[in-house]
Structures are given as structure tokens and as C-alpha cells.
């Protein structure tokens, strides 16, 4: 098995389609935070082609000491419930390096996979060709400014995934109310919790980090 070469930064992220609010969770390892990375999922790539890259926003959820730790965090984020949710672009559970072994997908996920395969080139090496085509491309000042702003506004910053109530008081000052919603829903996953929270009048944002606080895998600053 090929050993992963460690990079300076390892993080989990969520990409949001600003047109239809669909999301995609993932991990990235890089030596340059301004490398222009915007996810690599099959459905996500198709959506970016359809709606335009400018209509997608990437938010960093948390930084980790190494790639394995980031993968472990991704496993917590991308559960089978997330994969089966029609409002996500994720086709595989997280933390497994792309393997689909050992879990059963819903009819919704099968449909997502089917759509992802339509029109897909059959020859091997296509993804490598696409990646190489991006090498050497310079990022515009506007793109760099947007990524810098995203990092500065990241509520988790470089504090190793410890959420802070200071950045979004509407969410974090009401954490007990949202926890009650979570418990009453049978301790649902991040996607369902988000839907329930929005229905209760809370912000349309990711509740993945808050969910980890509820489960005891993350601490609140």
C-alpha cells in the first residue's frame, strides 16, 4: 500500500452549492492553503460544471496534525446517512479512501451513482489528465482574497477543531436547545440535525462540529 506523503496542512471541509444548498464533505492535504482546491467528488465536479465554480463556497471545518487524523474526522462527518441524503454530493462514506465495501446504499444513492456515471469517460487515467491540466495555473487575486476571508472567518481556525461560540452566537449560545432537538430526533446525523435546526429557526449552516460536541468527540472553547 502506497504511503501518504505528509503535507503541512491537513483539514476537513464542506463545500456548499449557493444555488441549491447541496453540500459536499471532504478532506484535503496541502503545503499551500491558496492552492485553489475545491473538492474532487464526481457529482461535485458535474455540479460545478453546470452551475459554475463561482457558485460554490468552501469552508474549512478543522485542521489536523496529520492526514490520518483528517481522515478519521471525515469518517465522523460522512456517514451512511450523509451518503444516502439527496442534498449531498458525497457518494462514499468518509475515512475509507474511496472504498464502498461493507455498507448498503439506498435507492437514492444508487440513483446518485448512476447519474455520476453517465457520460463518464471509460479510459483509465482520465482523472490524472484533469489534475495535470490544472498544474501551473495561477489563482486570481479575487480567488486568493476569497480563500483568505474564508480562513479568517473560519469559526474553528487553527484551534484543532474546537468550536467557539464567539463566531456564531445564534448557534452556539443556543447549543442546549439544539442539543434537545438532536436528542428528541433520536440523536440523528449532521444532515438531519441541520434540517431540524433550520425548521426551528436556527441558521442555515453546518452543524457537524456541534454534533461532535454532543457526541463528546470535540470540546467547546
Swiss-Prot record:
GO terms for molecular function: DNA binding; endonuclease activity. The keyword Calcium does not apply. The keyword Magnesium applies. Residues 138-150 have a biased composition (Basic and acidic residues). Residues 8-91 form the GIY-YIG domain. Coiled coil: none annotated. Its EC number is 3.1.-.-. Keywords: Endonuclease, Hydrolase, Magnesium, Nuclease. It is an enzyme of class 3 (hydrolase). InterPro entries: GIY-YIG_endonuc, GIY-YIG_endonuc_sf, NUMOD3. It holds the Pfam family NUMOD3. Residues 137-164 are annotated as: Disordered. Its cofactor is Mg(2+). To endonucleases of group I introns of fungi and phage. Probably involved in the movement of the endonuclease-encoding DNA. This is Endonuclease segA. It comes from Enterobacteria phage T4.
Amino acid at each position: 500500500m502506497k504511503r501518504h506523503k505528509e503535507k503541512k496542512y491537513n483539514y476537513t471541509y464542506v463545500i456548499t452549492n449557493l444555488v441549491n444548498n447541496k453540500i459536499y464533505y471532504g478532506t484535503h492535504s496541502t503545503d499551500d492553503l491558496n492552492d485553489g482546491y475545491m473538492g474532487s467528488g464526481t457529482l461535485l465536479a458535474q455540479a460545478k460544471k453546470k452551475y459554475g465554480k463561482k457558485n460554490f463556497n468552501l469552508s474549512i471545518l478543522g485542521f489536523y496534525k496529520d492526514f490520518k487524523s483528517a481522515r478519521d474526522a471525515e469518517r465522523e462527518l460522512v456517514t451512511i446517512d450523509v451518503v444516502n441524503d439527496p442534498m449531498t454530493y458525497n457518494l462514499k462514506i468518509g475515512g475509507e479512501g474511496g472504498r464502498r465495501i461493507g455498507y448498503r446504499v439506498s435507492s437514492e444513492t444508487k440513483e446518485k451513482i448512476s447519474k455520476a456515471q453517465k457520460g463518464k469517460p471509460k479510459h483509465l487515467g482520465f482523472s490524472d489528465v484533469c489534475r495535470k491540466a490544472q498544474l501551473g495555473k495561477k489563482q486570481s487575486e479575487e480567488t486568493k482574497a476569497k480563500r483568505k476571508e474564508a480562513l479568517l472567518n473560519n469559526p474553528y481556525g487553527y484551534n484543532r477543531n474546537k468550536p467557539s461560540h464567539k463566531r456564531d452566537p445564534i448557534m452556539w449560545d443556543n447549543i442546549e436547545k439544539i442539543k434537545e432537538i438532536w436528542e428528541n430526533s433520536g440523536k440523528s446525523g449532521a444532515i438531519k440535525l441541520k434540517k431540524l435546526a433550520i425548521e426551528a429557526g436556527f441558521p442555515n449552516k453546518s452543524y457537524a462540529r456541534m454534533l461532535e460536541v454532543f457526541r463528546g468527540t470535540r470540546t467547546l472553547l
